[in-house]
Amino acid sequence: GMGDSRIEVLKGIDLEIERGEFCVLLGPSGSGKSTLLNIIGGIDGADSGSITIDGERIEDMTEKKLSLYRRKHLGYIFQMYNLIPNLTVRENIEVGAYLSDKPLDVDELLHTLGIYEHQRKLPNQLSGGQQQRTAIGRAIVKNPDILLCDEPTGALDYNTGKSILKLLQNMCREKGMTVIIITHNQALAPMADRLIHIKNGQVARMESNENPTSIDEIEW
């Protein structure tokens, strides 16, 4: 029956990302970028192949270990901001901090994100951009080893988007965080240490960039 038809989203993807790199996965929508991010994040399983982080294969981890890996080592920024509706901006970010044994300073982060003066508001009292910044704060406050971002500036105006990317670039540089961003915005390519072009579920090509451009110098 129809139920058996399987669509292969990713085929023979082979890539390596170094610790502390700012990596951009570039490709049109529907090219399999989000699926790849979910597999790295341990949210989706791959039917075959393996993902190794720090020498450990994700598919060999027990449920308990996988959930610990996600909680302690991963930050995840989705296009949809799944904020907890009955918690304030500050409390939403503190939820992220509780999960970590090395969290960033919440006040400092609220300032950096430009939402310090909105910290007592509930999500439904915020603009889309403020909600997105709160969601980003919750992911970053954990001070994760790996930060996965799915079109992190998708819903943001140009300046807010730029300030968020600057924050992500700084986190990568200052904290040695591995940041993986998926986007269809070609303009972001020069800011990456590593640029991975994804096309029809495959790595079309991979480029390393010795001298990444600061986001300040990028226009789109």
PLM regions with names:
Residues 1-191, 197:
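ABC family nucleotide-binding domain
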Residues 202-220:
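Conserved beta-strand-loop-alpha-helix hinge in the C-terminal portion
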